Amino acid sequence: MAYAIIEASDKQLWVEPGRFYDLDRLDADLDQSLTLDKVLLVQDEGAPQIGQPYVAGATVQVTVLSHPRGRKVTVYKMTPKKKTRKKQGHRQDLTRVLVESITVGGKVLTANAADLPKSEADIDAAG
């Protein structure tokens, strides 16, 4: 099983080819292909390649699937014995990306064809 740990949207993610992930909103169009080059670790067969801080020559190719909004988070602030109450909600803007491949040292790591989703409906049913 090939995987990589990347840094995207100021967060670290464990990504595998053929899977989709929700990142903080990226400025990209739908079906646009992006290359993420902040790869901290790559694991294929054998020992993992660990970067200091990034693995040289390693990239992750992703495709933008959609721009959803996250679940609502309710913030409720109250002062006891006073009539001070404040209720706020927040929904984070997200970008759903599909990891197409991981490239390290000229070697391209992709998912098996059986593991990839067949359609957009399969992606929505899985997540």
UniProtKB/Swiss-Prot annotation:
Q: What SUPFAM superfamilies does its record include?
A: L21p-like (SSF141091)
Per its record, what are the GO molecular function terms?
Answer: rRNA binding; structural constituent of ribosome
Q: Which UniProt keywords apply?
A: Ribonucleoprotein, Ribosomal protein, RNA-binding, rRNA-binding
Q: Which GO terms describe its biological process?
A: translation
According to its UniProt entry, the function of this protein is described as: This protein binds to 23S rRNA in the presence of protein L20.
PANTHER family named among the record's database cross-references: 50S RIBOSOMAL PROTEIN L21 (PTHR21349), LARGE RIBOSOMAL SUBUNIT PROTEIN BL21M (PTHR21349:SF0)
Q: What is this protein called?
A: Large ribosomal subunit protein bL21
* Organism of provenance: Synechococcus sp. (strain ATCC 27144 / PCC 6301 / SAUG 1402/1) (Anacystis nidulans)
Q: Recite the lineage of the species.
A: Bacteria, Bacillati, Cyanobacteriota, Cyanophyceae, Synechococcales
Task: Please name the gene that encodes this protein.
Answer: rplU
